[in-house]
Amino acid sequence: MYVVHVEMSPEAIATQKPYLDLGLTEAEYDRFAELIGHQPNDTEIGLASGMWSEHCAYKYSKPVLRQFWTKNERVLMGPGEGAGVIDIGEGKAVVFKAESHNHPSAVEPYEGAATGVGGIIRDIFSIGAKPVAMLDSLAFGDIEQPHTQHLVDRIVAGIGGYGNAIGIPTVGGETNFDGSYTRNPLVNAMCVGIMDKDQIQKGKAAGVGNALIYVGAKTGRDGINGASFASGDFSDEEAADRSAVQVGDPFMEKLLMDACLEITGHHQEALVGIQDMGAAGLVSSSVEMAGKANSGMVLDLDLIPQREAEMTPFEIMLSESQERMLLCVRAGFEQEVLAVFADYDLDAAIVGHVIAGHQYQLYHHGKLVCDVPVSSLTDDAPIYHQQGKMPKRLAQPAADFDPIITDPVQIWTDMMAMPTIADKSSLYKRYDAQVQTNTVVLPGSDAAVIRIRGTHRALAMTTDSKDVTCILIAGGCGNECWLKRARNLVASGAEPLGITDCLNFGDPTKPEAFYELAEAAKGIIAATKAFNAPVISGNVSLYNETNGEAIYPTPMIGMVGLIEDLSTITTAAFKQADDLIYLVGETHGDFNGSELQKLQTGEVTGKLFDFDLEAEKQHQHFVLKAIREHLITAAHDLSDGGLLVALAEMGFDAQLGAQINVTLPTAWGFSETQGRFLLTVSPENQAAFEALHGPAQLIGRVQAPPEFEVTTVNQHFSASLQQLQTAFEEALPCHMNQKA
């Protein structure tokens, strides 16, 4: 239960130092006082605690984020606004962003996940885009533990409950399991929107005398100081603090979304800027809008719609009540905008104005309760240049894992049941993937695909994180995660356009954790430049620790690609017997960090291979060219579990088996060498396909009998499709005590 905030005098704040509990250091308090020219009062110190948090100021991560490559010929708007925007031709643009809601979901899984969905949707429609798809990336602890099972059930319910109710399809995602996430689950949500590229909106408040209009849910005491809550380590006591978690209302969000899209689409002459009230609530949205326009601003807090009595200025400004937006509207157009919101039965009020100068002023009950420079809460927030230190695990010599396989069919069956590999349909079937009727490829293939209405084109989209790689090679995890997402899009027939990211790491004040963050970013940068697909949006979620124990470093990549012709959409499933099976790319004995290593040892050890970006580019360009020439009937990237796992997955939907003959040791069928694809080609297209002279080797053919017959250099074995599929489909429901 939330404890009502008790205001303190500036003198009491200076001596009792309550700001320490809000995430500010003594040095930061002194610096803020210097910037504003007086001892901060209760409201002002609250605003600083929110705006100077890592969640809002990126004070530890900004030096890393500034190195990202964020522009190319397609990018219309990059990081810094609610979401990034990319030109997709024909007057249209795609808008997308991912956000994390990790800490709230650990405390209150249903509402934490639901409000994470709501927040990222608002980011998209604040740009003027209609949200058309949701994706997620989830990470949980040991699935055998009841607490993990509870988190899985409630987080999935929260995502589905909000997305289904608002009418946006959840079309893709991933779910991973590892003990490092037992106390700190990861909930990363991504939203994609489509818009006319000449209607892009920004979050700015410019023009002296222009009005600030608040619209949406009334402000309450939920989620107060949530930005600071998300910018610190967890303890067991804090894990029980549900007052820091917001409560969402998807039906209110639907009204708010439709009303805002009407404003951005049909009342552009009235609108100066628009922004979601997300982390740090009203203070963040308002002061950021003023900062971007180099303006001053005054707000009357008595005019803020409130659902609870006697709220203090601290509470009003730092509440993170959901489903709220702030608009800057040109003088003389206020009633036009208010009338639109009235049509949707939304609470809306003029709560302030843009003023001359650069001060940020708040009035409450006729009293000036905040008078600080806008820059003191935005541009002048501290930036810390940390020095990283290589973790001991990376500096120490480590032996390569060399698996021994005596019963390949049993190993294959067990691999299909590994929590990270196993079928997740029992989870994603709780999401509506087809609302809006644009979804062409449903969850379960390499990437989701939605059509772009009014055209012959489509968008492919996917998410992925790579925690295990980061344990073994810090820079490689960002690289591998990026490349894996690109392969997913290419296998669907799409050219990657750009990415959004969520960088989920531990405490950045610890040199080893900061090293992991910085090195992962370097890997992402290298891949974005090599493939001309920049970072256009994202967020950082640090302090993912409980009682000093951190999660695995986990960069999450969300990627969107363009399919020029609907007829070239490709899925992973076998299509017909007698199609030829080709393996693209070389296979090596890469078992360190693999699912096979986890199965046989329960550990993740060893060093990872180096990445060959040029070879990866060659493979992806070859596959995309073959797909665009209509030579490929099915395509699947090889990742978790390697060749044999991918082969089985391709057979399940059509109930088709395969015969393959590979010049590899049996164990290498489970190797996780990167940069590989499995392709199927109809016999009549064999000559045309091989005439492309790509890095592809014919290894077998699809067969009608539901058996996988495999010949390696040292063994011949046969596995029943039914046996593999049963293991694949029943593993997760069994753990969750569900019926398959």
UniProtKB/Swiss-Prot annotation:
Keywords for this protein: ATP-binding, Cytoplasm, Ligase, Magnesium, Metal-binding, Nucleotide-binding, Purine biosynthesis
Residues the entry annotates as binding Mg(2+) 2: D123, D276
Top enzyme class: ligase
Positions annotated as active site in the UniProt record: H55, H101 (proton acceptor)
Database matches in CDD domains: PurL_repeat1 (cd02203), PurL_repeat2 (cd02204)
Superkingdom classification of source: Bacteria
Listed GO biological process terms: 'de novo' IMP biosynthetic process
Residues that coordinate or bind ATP: Y58, K97, D501, G538
Binding site for Mg(2+) 1: E99, N539
Catalyzed reactions: N(2)-formyl-N(1)-(5-phospho-beta-D-ribosyl)glycinamide + L-glutamine + ATP + H2O = 2-formamido-N(1)-(5-O-phospho-beta-D-ribosyl)acetamidine + L-glutamate + ADP + phosphate + H(+)
Keyword check for Amino-acid biosynthesis: no
Pathway assignment: Purine metabolism; IMP biosynthesis via de novo pathway; 5-amino-1-(5-phospho-D-ribosyl)imidazole from N(2)-formyl-N(1)-(5-phospho-D-ribosyl)glycinamide: step 1/2
Oligomer and partners: Monomer. Part of the FGAM synthase complex composed of 1 PurL, 1 PurQ and 2 PurS subunits.
Family statement drawn from the similarity comment of this UniProt entry: Belongs to the FGAMS family.
Name of the protein in its database record: Phosphoribosylformylglycinamidine synthase subunit PurL
Annotated organism of origin: Lacticaseibacillus casei
This protein's encoding gene: purL
